[in-house]
Amino acid sequence: RTYIDTEGIKGVSIEPGFGNSLLFDDEAYEPLYQLLEEQEMILMATFSGSITPVLDPSLPGRFQKIAKNHPGMKAVAGHGGGPWVREMVCAAFFAENIYLAPDLYSVNCPGWQDWRDAAAGLARDKILFGSSYPLCSVSRAVENVKEWGLFPEDERKIFRENGAGLLGLK
């Protein structure tokens, strides 16, 4: 709480299941989620089947549950929630506070076409740009999004507007 007040921190990043046995909806995270909601802050959760020994920690319902239980907290699924792309797109569409950052999984990974479709359609306001540098360079991440073949206004949302809105910079 001290750093929120003195440093203007906008959010916190967690990695459930990576080096620990916690799941998104583990009660141990509840005080953090409550604080983030009270302060209207951002939760950036690394969300990917590739970082955990089993897929259970990354099930979309767990992430959706905490977002719905804390509507004042903005919840970003880092790596976009893969491999559960379609499920996460639906979760973001139905929950005002869920955002998706597909970053290095934006092309040539299972479900990447769903990112493209979501960015051009029902989740166009929920897709955030990211690279996961150094795993994927910023220039490569930009090229990946451009490969989606979106209209310029949809690219603008991904590259700037959606992130600016999330951070309260609009």
What residues fall within each predicted segment?
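Mid-to-C-terminal alpha-helical segments outside catalytic/metal-binding sites
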Residues: 123-126, 137-170
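Active-site-proximal loop/turn and secondary-structure-junction residues that shape catalytic pockets
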Residues: 16-18, 49-51, 81-82, 104-106, ...
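Acidic (Asp/Glu)-rich catalytic clusters
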Residues: 1-8, 29-39, 65-70, 89-96, ...
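Short acidic/histidine-rich active-site segments
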Residues: 79, 101-105, 122-139
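Active-site gating/metal-coordination segments in enzymes
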Residues: 1-51
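Conserved, mostly hydrophobic/aromatic
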Residues: 3, 12, 36, 79, ...
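Structural preference for beta-strand elements that scaffold enzyme active sites
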Residues: 9-13, 42-44, 74-76, 97-101, ...
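Histidine/acidic-residue-rich catalytic or RNA/ligand-binding cores of hydrolases
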Residues: 54-63, 85-95, 110-119, 135-147
